[in-house]
Amino acid sequence: MIDFLMISTRSTKRGVIEIYPKFIIKKSSDLMIRGGDFYAIWLEDRGLWSTDEQDALQLIDWELDKYAEENRKNFDSSIKVLHMWDSESGMIDSWHKYCQKQMRDSFHMLDEKLIFSNTPTNKKDYASKRLNYPLEEGATDAWNKLMSTIYSEEERTKIEWAIGSIVCGESKKLQKFMVLYGAAGTGKSTVLNIVQQLFEGYYSVFDAKALGSSSNSFALEAFKTNPLVAIQHDGDLSRIEDNTRLNSLVSHELMTVNEKFKSTYANRFKCLLFMRTNKPVK
């Protein structure tokens, strides 16, 4: 059973035995709270964490039904399971109170390394997703033909170095910001589209202008999924008012994240930034 849950019973005036969830105040190894709300739950059957709260509700209901089935013969009266999916049971309100008011933040950032389709995982990997392909040797004829057509050998080496650093995990330590500059139609977006396909689920899009605006307190919300890659297809660094936040992001410094309708929390982002621009960087 998940370690933050206890199955309890009580009798009603009509003699019905109610089976309901009781949530334990503790530092759980199966549940994470971030920003004063639900963040993730461990799903043993998948071997992954999930940030979908519905998965948590379904898992709790499964535990309730399992308990009811295993102990049905021990009850003399009829039983009623108070499910999370039933809004009239009031259990969903108890859950929200537990996550949002009674528990304190306790979390480990998820997805800080790539998980390929052939990568074994456990709870301590803190992974919530997988890429849909394995990491193994193979032919790269199409890639070689494309890159030799649109980029010089020197520029191609830089791009492949950046991609390789993400695959091997070194990008989390690099204090680099990749800017693809050139005229329209020179293949900048082509490369970024390939990067997105390579790291599906591990990238997010960002707005450099928002990061450089001192008045935008929610600029880091674009990074709330803790991406390993952040991409802007059409950026303009000339409009940056204050580069402090951008520099801290590139340097992987500890930053305060302000998400809408949630409490602030601190995080050290591990992403490598890519930007396409038609304007020279000064």
Task: Walk through the language-model features, giving the residues of each.
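Conserved catalytic/switch belt of AAA+ P-loop NTPases
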Residues: 200, 243-265
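Structured core elements
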Residues: 179, 230-231, 273-275
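AAA+/SF3 P-loop NTPase mechanochemical coupling elements
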Residues: 218-225, 258-276
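P-loop NTPase catalytic core of nucleic-acid-dependent motor ATPases
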Residues: 31-55, 107-228
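Walker B catalytic acidic pair
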Residues: 233-235
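Short regulatory helix/loop adjacent to the ATP-binding pocket of P-loop NTPases
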Residues: 280-282
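Alpha-helical scaffold elements adjacent to nucleotide-binding pockets in ATP/GTP-utilizing enzyme cores
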Residues: 59, 63, 191-194, 241-249, ...
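Intein modules and their embedded homing endonuclease domains
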Residues: 1-126
